[in-house]
């Protein structure tokens, strides 16, 4: 059994705020590490203290706006830690970039998610901890343990706390392939489930609603909010079908491009995301945006791994799939 004295936490530059919260929750100081980019675009890291014979946890979501740089920095950090004679390396990746590219949609396409998994594993990582991977098969892309934490319990608690007084609810899956995630929430809330089937005909995009939302509070459950265009279209259709209010809760908020403007101009009452991805000051000032802190869930998982305890759903405060 490992002790906290043999554990090191190292933060990449992708999300230092997340690493700080994790450090406080674990009561372990972040190890010194300098990361920089040369003018030619190359990445360099220097460890500021010994990690010899230590179990090292590298905290680095591979997220936007610099997803490729963040991936490269993670690989370089892992190589530096491995060459410094660490005992065990865990990559803590709250958001796994390229997760959408997990299968071939057309012929002659790559499966980039698998390529990223290969790179991470080959660099020397012994274990990966992530949250709400875009597809379950991503765990199978690795030949090392992958712990996929699930934010559903925190999302359910948020709904119960903030939307309890609003009346009858219906949970919405904004896509057919997200039904399983949405059903987990609807079962916990003991409410109906409806599905929005996204259809594209030429340049025109539309959604077909399967289910009844008339006179109900519609709660969209999704995985990633990127441009927010799908969420905005979903809210418009749900309101046109008689929904009294429309809220959206998603695991990861990339909020790319004009996402904030799209959100502000949409019929969504509120968009709730987690802090798996850092947000810009512009995003933080958006009145419709709310953020759930998931670092306590990661702290619990890390503590159980360090002490050799189970982190299955039956014995933990959170869900892992």
Curated annotation (Swiss-Prot):
What are the record keywords, sorted? ATP-binding, Cytoplasm, Kinase, Magnesium, Metal-binding, Nucleotide biosynthesis, Nucleotide-binding, Transferase
- The answer to whether keyword Metal-binding applies is yes
Annotated residues that bind Mg(2+) are located at 132, 147
Entry cofactors: Mg(2+)
The catalytic activity, as recorded, is: D-ribose 5-phosphate + ATP = 5-phospho-alpha-D-ribose 1-diphosphate + AMP + H(+)
**What GO cellular-component annotations does this UniProt entry give?**
cytoplasm; ribose phosphate diphosphokinase complex
> Source organism's superkingdom?
Eukaryota
Compartment annotation: Cytoplasm
Entry EC no(s)? 2.7.6.1
The segments labelled Binding of phosphoribosylpyrophosphate in the record are: 214-229
Gene3D superfamilies, per this entry? 3.40.50.2020
Q: Which GO terms describe its biological process?
A: 5-phosphoribose 1-diphosphate biosynthetic process; purine nucleotide biosynthetic process
Look up the record and name the pathway of this protein: Metabolic intermediate biosynthesis; 5-phospho-alpha-D-ribose 1-diphosphate biosynthesis; 5-phospho-alpha-D-ribose 1-diphosphate from D-ribose 5-phosphate (route I): step 1/1
Give one GO molecular function term. ribose phosphate diphosphokinase activity
The record's annotation in NCBIfam families points to: PRK01259.1 (NF002320), ribP_PPkin (TIGR01251)
**Family, as annotated:** Belongs to the ribose-phosphate pyrophosphokinase family.
According to UniProt, the name of this protein is: Ribose-phosphate pyrophosphokinase C
Native source species: Dictyostelium discoideum (Social amoeba)
Q: Which gene encodes it?
A: prsC
């Amino acid at each position: 059994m490992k002790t906290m004295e043999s554990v090191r936490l190292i933060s990449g530059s992708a999300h230092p705020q997340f690493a700080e919260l994790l450090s406080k929750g674990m009561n372990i100081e972040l190890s010194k590490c300098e990361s920089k980019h040369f003018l030619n675009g190359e990445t360099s890291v220097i460890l500021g203290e010994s990690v010899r014979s230590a179990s090292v946890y590298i905290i680095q979501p591979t997220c936007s706006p610099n997803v490729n740089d963040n991936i490269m920095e993670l690989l370089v950090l892992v190589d530096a830690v491995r060459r410094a004679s660490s005992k065990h390396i865990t990559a803590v990746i709250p958001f796994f970039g390229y997760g959408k590219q997990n299968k071939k949609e057309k012929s002659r396409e790559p499966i980039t998610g698998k390529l990223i998994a290969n790179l991470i594993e080959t660099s020397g990582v012994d274990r990966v901890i992530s949250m709400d991977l875009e597809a379950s098969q991503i765990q199978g892309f690795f030949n090392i343990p992958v712990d996929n934490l699930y934010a559903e319990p925190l999302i359910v608690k948020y709904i119960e706390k903030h939307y309890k007084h609003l009346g009858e609810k219906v949970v919405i899956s904004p896509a057919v392939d997200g039904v399983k995630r949405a059903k987990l929430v609807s079962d916990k809330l003991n409410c109906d489930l409806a599905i929005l089937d996204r259809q594209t005909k030429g340049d025109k995009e539309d959604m077909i609603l399967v289910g009844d939302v008339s006179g109900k509070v519609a709660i969209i459950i999704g995985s990633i909010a990127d441009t927010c265009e799908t969420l905005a279209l979903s809210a418009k259709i749900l309101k046109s079908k008689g929904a009294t209010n429309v809220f959206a809760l998603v695991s990861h908020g990339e909020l790319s491009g004009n996402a904030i403007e799209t959100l502000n101009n949409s019929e969504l009452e509120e968009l709730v995301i987690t802090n798996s991805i850092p947000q810009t000051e512009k995003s933080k000032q958006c009145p419709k945006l709310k953020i759930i802190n998931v670092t306590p869930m990661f702290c619990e998982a890390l503590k159980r791994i360090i002490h050799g305890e189970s982190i299955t759903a039956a014995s933990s405060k959170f869900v892992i799939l």
